[in-house]
Amino acid sequence: PRLFALHHSATQYFSAAALPSPIPNPDIPDNQLFISNKWHDAVSKKTFPTVSPATGEVIGHVAEGDWADVDLAAKAARAAFRLGSPWRWMDALKRGWLLNHLADLVERDCVYLASLESLDNGKPFQESYVLDLDEVIKVYRYFAGWADKWHGKTIPMDGEHFCFTRHEPVGVCCQIIPWNFPLVMQSWKLALALAMGNTVVTKVAEQTPFSALYLASLIKEVGLPPGLVNIVTGYGPTAGAAIAHHMDIGKVAFTGSTKVGHLIQKAAGNSSLKRVTLELGGKSLSIVLADADMDHAVEQRQEALFFNMGQCCCPGSWTFIEESIYDEFLERTVEKAKQRRVGNPFDLDTQQGPQVDRERFERILGYIQLGQKEGAKLLCGGEHFRQQCFFIKPTVFGGVQDDMRIAREEIFGPVQPLFKFKKIEEVIERADNTRYGLAAAVFTQDLDKAMYFTQALQTGTVWVNTYNVVTCHTPLGGFKEPGNGRELGEDGLKAYTEVKTVTIKVPQKNS
């Protein structure tokens, strides 16, 4: 999700002159597994290539971890969590201090980290630097402040008893990180787990491993105890599946596809009934009423869909427009999409980079062809842009019907279908007729209508006259298939602790 209010786009928020120069060819960090504060080859000695989505060229090769490596990482994390270990003895205030120190080091190296993200992921450098790295720093600092403020309570009981609760860490927490926001999504999970006193095994996406591996070197520089954070690179069906099935792991947090989320939930149930937090995305929606500020709504919808090349968990891929303004909204949307600058991620004027890899690139082009076959009208874009790499021009479809596959299925790319509606009751019924429910937005100047939508829409988040405003302070999660649990905010911490009830018999109790 976009990490600040979209009434300013990134290019408006910071001019190119205000940005530091990116590093187009950053040095590649250690390409091994990080276990117990040491670098290791995979047990199998296998490696796999990482490809630049902007050029199609191999950036480097990374250790291919699998079950044996996950087992070593889990054992290291379990040892770091043992009773009496330095981590278990550490004051909560000190845990917070270490997280703040990690934020300091990320801030020190933010240009390099942003350059790694753009090289590995293909996103424009200005977004990696202005949005992603800024959010990463804020997340570590925010949850550093929670480390010594999450506590239990005393509970009045009948009889001669004194009762209190303790909030204890779950233990070994595993985190499966997606490729669309590698550092951001890692911080969303790692900061909370460490603030609450857990130890961690992280499996990073095979498409985007390098920023996480560099963060491992910063974790070591901070002085976190060995085994506290372990990072495994590898593929989902091997390393990811090993995490989901491992008996010594107490919690899994996963951000990714609905299909894989189902597999992880099933594996957790078939193994140790470990806790599972799933943020699975899907299709999110926006509803634009006739009284909305047209310029603002068009701008918000463009950024909500095309930001990060459409590779977001809640990209606003359904846009319902009231019939009386549909034609004008369509015209302005197409005009703005044609103006969007697609190109080299390291060009500071670039607004859209390539898709992350060939598989996703070809999948998106397949949906564009499918939309045309189903009868939707291609109004702009839909083309491969540049050879030997994975650019797709911003694409807008009109005349889309609710039963078309481009309407029902997650595309995860720069494809914007537009729908029209006549009545509020009608659009609410259509909007809720889906298995997804992560986020929604409504654009209107009528507060009564806005409040009605916030109550009626079956989504975990509803924005009014804005989109993708996600910060470390507020919880994020979905209804229905987008998953369970919440990330971020105070609510996000609940998944990382167990509540223990302690009851003591006392000889005399007085109020």
UniProtKB/Swiss-Prot annotation:
Reaction catalysed by this enzyme: an aldehyde + NAD(+) + H2O = a carboxylate + NADH + 2 H(+)
E.C. code: 1.2.1.3
Binding site for NAD(+): 256-261
N6-acetyllysine: residues bearing it: 45-46, 377, 393, 420, 423
Compartments, record wording: Mitochondrion matrix
Organism: Bos taurus
Family membership noted in the UniProt record: Belongs to the aldehyde dehydrogenase family.
Spans through the membrane: none
Modified residues (N6-succinyllysine): 46, 75, 377, 393, 420
Protein name: Aldehyde dehydrogenase X, mitochondrial
Boundaries of the annotated transit peptide in chain numbering: 1-11
Active site residues per record: 279, 313
Subunit structure: Homotetramer.
Site (Transition state stabilizer) residue list: 180
